[in-house]
């Protein structure tokens, strides 16, 4: 974290990042604990939505964010192909069980194991110690993250290929075989990806991402900094705060892209589960409004699931980007205390 040259800086209890900044063991513990919270939220919210689900009202007009995602993945259908929530409670309970496992593991890494991996007894773990101004260390860890993302993409593609996912074009679950190697098709959708209306193209894009991420991950793990580590390559800029700012930029950008996807695309976000497409409006800021009849909507202040998802994603993404700018400026050495001091001195001069 930025200390502005003060070696004895102290942080308040609310600055949670300061506890794990230079302690890789606790950093991992916080990641695992965060995973547990996500699992608990997913499992608990799914049970909450399932208990209130009314089959006489369209799913997109109810509180159905988690149910809609499961339905899109082809889960919750009976043998006749009708969505009844079959097996959804089991999935939710498994998430709650795993949340307890993740929570216990997070506490173990935080309280029982070595807070700094470079002091640990296992030689392999020392490679994952945190050295924020060491590009070789950061690229090694980045490589593993990319491989995990690539594997997740493969799982999704294989799920669609063997189990099948919901195709709104025919109103039922079907298996999807991606066009492996059809990179031209993927490349051709750089600017019109919001209009994709084929699940084969969606899965081909995920297969392409898997290839790029796993290849990039292997590259980052196997390679090191070429030549001298100069200021042009980031010397003096790499820090915990800089990495935090880039992470915020990434998640903010993904949230904004997801908002546009959800608002307009009815192949990835079917009308059957999310409600009708939205219209983009402009007021103090951009926002989306429902275009269909939502008089029967029972949640989200009378709006559809699609409207709730799109608007919340957009505004969260916007504020994540602001957080990116804040932390990026701090990482570059900008002292916001000078702004406060300048405003205070200006006010004193005017008075």
UniProtKB/Swiss-Prot annotation:
Superkingdom of origin: Bacteria
Cofactor (UniProt): divinyl chlorophyll a; divinyl chlorophyll b
GO terms under cellular component: photosystem I; photosystem II; plasma membrane-derived thylakoid membrane
GO molecular function: chlorophyll binding
Annotated TM spans: 27-47, 81-101, 140-160, 202-222, 242-262, 309-329
Protein keywords: Chlorophyll, Chromophore, Membrane, Photosynthesis, Photosystem I, Photosystem II, Thylakoid, Transmembrane, Transmembrane helix
Compartment(s) where it occurs, according to its Swiss-Prot or TrEMBL record: Cellular thylakoid membrane
One of the GO biological process terms: photosynthetic electron transport chain
Membrane topology: Multi-pass membrane protein
One Pfam family cited in the UniProt record for this chain: PSII
Database matches in SUPFAM superfamilies: Photosystem II antenna protein-like
Function: The antenna complex functions as a light receptor, it captures and delivers excitation energy to photosystems II and I. The Prochlorales pcb genes are not related to higher plant LHCs.
Record family assignment: Belongs to the PsbB/PsbC family. IsiA/Pcb subfamily.
Other facts noted in the record for this chain: This low-light-adapted strain contains 7 pcb genes.
Subunit composition and interactions: The antenna complex consists of divinyl chlorophylls (a and b) and divinyl chlorophyll a/b binding proteins and binds more divinyl chlorophyll b than does the antenna complex from high-light-adapted Prochlorococcus.
Name by which UniProt lists this protein: Divinyl chlorophyll a/b light-harvesting protein PcbC
Gene: pcbC
């Amino acid at each position: 974290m930025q200390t502005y040259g003060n070696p004895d800086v102290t942080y308040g209890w609310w600055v949670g990042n300061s506890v794990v900044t230079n302690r890789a063991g606790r950093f991992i513990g916080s990641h695992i604990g965060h995973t547990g919270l996500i699992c608990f939220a997913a499992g608990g919210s799914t049970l909450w939505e399932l208990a209130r689900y009314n089959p006489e009202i369209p799913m997109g007009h109810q509180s159905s964010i988690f149910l809609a995602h499961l339905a899109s993945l082809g889960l919750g259908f009976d043998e006749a192909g009708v969505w009844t929530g079959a097996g959804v409670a089991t999935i939710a309970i498994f998430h709650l069980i795993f949340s307890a496992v993740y929570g216990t593991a997070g506490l173990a890494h935080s309280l029982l194991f070595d807070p700094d991996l470079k002091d640990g007894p296992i030689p392999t773990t020392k490679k994952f110690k945190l050295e924020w101004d060491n590009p070789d260390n950061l690229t090694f860890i980045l490589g593993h993250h990319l491989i995990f993302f690539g594997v997740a993409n493969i799982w999704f593609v294989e799920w669609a290929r063997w189990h099948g996912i919901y195709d709104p074009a025919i109103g039922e679950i079907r298996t999807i075989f991606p066009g492996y190697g059809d990179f031209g098709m993927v490349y051709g959708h750089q600017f019109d990806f919001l209009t994709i209306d084929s699940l084969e193209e969606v899965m081909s894009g995920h297969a392409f991402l898997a290839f790029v991420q796993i290849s990039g991950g292997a590259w980052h793990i196997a390679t090191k900094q070429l030549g001298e580590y100069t200021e042009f390559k980031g010397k003096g800029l790499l820090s915990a705060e800089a990495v935090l700012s880039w992470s915020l930029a990434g998640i903010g950008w993904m949230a904004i892209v997801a908002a546009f996807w959800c608002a307009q695309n009815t192949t990835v976000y079917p009308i059957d589960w999310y409600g009708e497409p939205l219209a983009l409006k402009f007021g103090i800021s951009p926002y989306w409004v429902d275009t269909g009849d939502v008089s029967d909507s029972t949640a989200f202040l009378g709006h559809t699931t699609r409207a709730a998802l799109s608007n919340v994603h957009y505004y969260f993404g916007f504020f994540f980007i602001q957080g990116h700018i804040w932390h990026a400026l701090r990482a570059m050495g900008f002292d916001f205390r000078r702004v406060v001091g300048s405003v205070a001195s200006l006010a004193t001069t005017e008075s």
